[in-house]
Amino acid sequence: MIERNGLQRMPFRLNRRHMISGMASAAVLLGSRQALGQARVQITEGNVAPLPIAIPNFVGGTPSDNEVGAGVAKVITNNLKRSGLFAPIDQAAYIEKITNIDVPPQFANWKTINAQALVTGRMTRQGDGRLKAEFRLWDVATGQQLAGQQYFTSPEYWRRIAHIISDQIYERLTGEKGYFDSRVVFVDESGSSQRRVKRLALMDQDGANVRYLTRGADLVITPRFSPSTQEVTYMEFGQGDPRVYLFNIETGQREIVGNFPGMSFSPRFAPDGQRIIMSLQQGGNSNLFVMDLRSKSTTRLTDTPAIDTSPSYSPDGARICFESDRGGKPQIYVMGATGGGAQRISFGEGSYSTPVWSPRGDYIAFTKQGGGQFSIGIIKPDGSGERILTSGFHNEGPTFAPNGRVLMFFRDPGGGGGPSLYTIDVSGRNELKVPTPGFASDPAWSPLLS
């Protein structure tokens, strides 16, 4: 038995251990090591035929439980559909109604509607007020159970449970980690273009549960998560020079990151969470510095008569990619995390900016400006394999999902409107708009919460 302990509720705490406990018994996981039949998604760089999957409403013991169960099934359905790897079957086509998940389904009924995988689940309220969630994942062709788990949580976290289950399904059927149990911090924009109010905001990756972290008194840009997901670093234009701040999501407290002369901007955490790398303006130049958050000591990494900005660490923390105009136009460079010689990796026509390293380490995403368009693309760290994923009037600010398979960015269509968030996978397929309350820009995807 696997036990995940801790049920204390923390209002802004994102870590799973303070919200949800789960356990998986041998009975629940029976068959999970069996060979897969047809229910398997092969992820390649080319087109992928989405896997037909049936996701009935989770059953419950009361009308209230049934309502929550329907909501959980809907969130799972939307998550898997938006990934582009799954084709959820309309519930109107179902022949069999699932009423008891402890009884194996009649797989012939699900084969008839061409389902290759089936998800069944149950939501029940416990005597202590907690919500118990259970699910089973079935291979319809073989009749084998592929996965199963049960969780206990406070009722208000039912959406979080749905995201965790979505990740379990995604991983079992693709062989790769999911990305649904994650958050996005972004800049919420409201008001006219002449009097735009910008606030830091936090939401689930699907656009739900939006929370505002700042009030909009000062302009904010480029928020970035810490590896623990408990802190955000960002740039704020207050009185005086723009500064880099550190915001604690749990407590709501913020602090300035170093009291440097001149501007500080483009902050990002190191993978260990103990350092922040940023650009500092000195005279007419901007160079890269790294600050140790414990000792407050600062180390200079670049020293050129140019503008070096937008740094991003490799997942292992050994290298940094950044933007520099030291060769004329802004281009992408890679160097060791302690400084030294930098290698230019972008050589296409146009200017390159906002580089960010994939959590997988295989690609660096960027914004490219040229030919009257702004494009989002990816390139390998050695400079090979450059690929443009999407182009338009103004696309900018890519950020990777925790599994490195999906990018989020913002697009401003012009014409007096405002920007919106979009996702696209690294093959350039499945471009989708992300729902937000208003205009939105500068997204940053968190690591997985669980």
Curated annotation (Swiss-Prot):
Keywords: Cell cycle, Cell division, Periplasm, Signal. Pfam families: PD40, TolB_N. GO terms for biological process: cell division; protein import. It is found in: Periplasm. Part of the Tol-Pal system, which plays a role in outer membrane invagination during cell division and is important for maintaining outer membrane integrity. GO terms for cellular component: periplasmic space. This is Tol-Pal system protein TolB. Residues 1-37 form the signal peptide. Belongs to the TolB family. NCBIfam families: propeller_TolB. It comes from Nitrobacter winogradskyi (strain ATCC 25391 / DSM 10237 / CIP 104748 / NCIMB 11846 / Nb-255). The keyword Ion transport does not apply. The Tol-Pal system is composed of five core proteins: the inner membrane proteins TolA, TolQ and TolR, the periplasmic protein TolB and the outer membrane protein Pal. They form a network linking the inner and outer membranes and the peptidoglycan layer.
